[in-house]
Every structure is written in structure tokens, then in C-alpha cells.
């Protein structure tokens, strides 16, 4: 069991590099592990190659270099020769001051992780959980989990499962599919932060939204839905489910061997 702490509504996990412990955000919405320039220096990580483009959640993304970390320990899991992306140091307008993200390159390698929100621990079980009767419900897209769900009317939707997002939201694709309902709601402006800075979006707030994943149901109030910019849909999925979903349960199981997520 690895202790988790909650800060700015996100889950942080201790990662040991060269005998020193650092707090990383546990982030299924990040394809790769990421560290800031200052942290890379502090860890003694070796910078390799030229800068590469790194996507950034809802934001524009940005360029980062890659760093070679010889040894990294997350609880009982020891990783050797880790390649992490190096981002610019957090800016003053970064609300989270994030300088370390543990991404899907590690999480997927664990096979299964269980996030016990009641005990605030992360469990990497010796034996993985059996596939539930409801079957597989996630796929990996650019190494990020996408989950299948249905709403209260039986409509099928797919969402990015992102533990690095504090809430949940509906995308411009969902808006376009539900234009009649969505267009009747008042438009607001919302600032969204991601790697690469802050982006301003036009949104509407859906007063009540229920969805079912497998055999578990969740309910959201005033869920933001992005208005398509200039009438153009840019999302390929119906939204992003973050801690706003996870916190409705006491335990969440991510199994990347049988490709399912289950909630208790």
C-alpha cells in the first residue's frame, strides 16, 4: 500500500529517486511521466535529445525535453531507465504549481492499480482483479484510458478517464450531439489550465447529468460543457472524467490487463 495525499483536489503519490522522495500527481490523463526543469536538476536526471511537443489536457500543450532517470521507485515497484518529459518550471499563474506528474507509462506497467479513496492509499495487487461480468469497458488511446458509458436516457458516450483533472466536463462533441438542450443554456466563460498555460473556453453548465459505467452510476450537478468554437467540433470524445467522478466512490480499480475500470 502506497500512501496518497490530496492537494488542490488531486491525488499525489511519493516517488523515490536516488534515495530522495518527491510528490508526483497520479495522472491517468498523461501519456508520460513529466518533471519540471528544476526537479530534473535536483534529481540528477540526464537531459537527452531535442525538445518534443507534449499535449496538455484542455490547453494548447507545449514543448519539453526528455530526461533519463536511472532508477525510480513507486512503493514496491522499481523502474529502471525511465524516460520522462521535462516541462518548463511552473509559472506564477499556474494554480497547482505542478512540477511532477506520474503518467500512464508507469501506471500501465503496474498492470492494475486500486485507488482506495476511503483509506487514501494506492494498492498494486499481487493478483489482479477478475474481469467483472459487465466486461471490458476501456481502451487506450495515445496511451490514455477512454471509458464507455451510458447516460440516463441510454445514450452511449466515451470519456477520457483523467485522474489528473480535479472535476469532470463535457466536450464540444457532447454539446454538438445534444445541441437542442445545450444551446438553450446560458453561455459562460471559463479558464482551463493545462500543460502550456491557460485557455479561455465558452461553456454552458448542464444542471444535472447522470451516467453509468459498468454497473456503477454517478451523478453530476452543473457539469460544464464546452461550446464548439466558431461552430467547429475539435474533440473526438464526449468529455473528461476526473476526480469529480472518482470521489463519488470509496475505491476505483484500473485494470490494464483485462482493460476495465470498476468502482466500489
Regions from the language model: what does each represent?
Residues 1-264:
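Pepsin/retropepsin-fold aspartyl endopeptidases
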Amino acid at each position: 500500500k502506497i500512501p496518497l495525499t490530496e492537494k488542490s483536489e488531486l491525488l499525489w503519490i511519493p516517488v523515490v529517486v536516488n534515495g530522495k522522495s518527491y510528490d508526483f500527481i497520479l495522472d491517468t490523463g498523461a501519456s508520460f511521466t513529466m518533471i519540471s526543469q528544476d526537479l530534473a536538476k535536483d534529481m540528477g536526471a540526464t537531459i537527452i535529445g531535442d525538445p518534443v511537443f507534449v499535449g496538455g489536457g484542455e490547453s494548447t500543450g507545449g514543448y519539453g525535453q526528455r530526461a533519463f532517470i536511472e532508477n525510480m521507485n513507486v512503493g514496491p515497484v522499481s523502474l529502471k531507465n525511465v524516460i520522462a518529459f521535462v516541462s518548463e518550471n511552473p509559472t506564477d499563474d499556474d494554480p497547482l504549481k505542478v512540477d511532477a506528474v506520474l503518467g500512464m507509462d508507469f501506471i500501465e506497467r503496474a498492470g492494475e492499480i486500486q485507488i482506495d479513496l476511503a483509506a487514501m492509499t494506492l494498492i498494486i495487487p499481487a493478483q489482479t482483479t477478475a474481469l467483472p461480468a459487465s466486461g471490458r469497458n476501456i481502451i487506450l488511446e495515445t496511451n490514455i484510458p477512454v471509458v464507455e458509458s451510458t447516460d440516463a436516457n441510454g445514450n452511449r458516450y466515451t470519456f477520457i478517464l483523467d485522474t489528473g483533472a480535479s472535476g469532470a466536463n463535457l466536450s464540444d462533441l457532447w454539446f454538438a450531439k445534444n445541441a437542442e438542450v445545450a444551446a438553450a443554456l446560458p453561455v459562460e466563460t471559463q479558464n482551463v489550465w493545462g500543460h502550456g498555460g491557460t485557455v479561455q473556453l465558452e461553456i454552458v453548465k448542464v444542471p444535472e447529468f447522470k451516467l453509468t459505467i459498468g454497473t456503477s452510476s454517478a451523478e453530476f450537478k452543473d457539469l460544464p460543457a464546452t461550446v464548439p468554437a466558431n461552430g467547429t467540433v475539435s474533440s473526438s470524445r464526449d468529455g473528461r472524467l476526473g476526480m469529480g467522478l472518482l470521489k463519488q466512490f470509496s475505491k476505483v480499480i484500473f485494470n490494464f490487463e483485462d482493460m476495465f475500470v470498476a468502482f466500489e
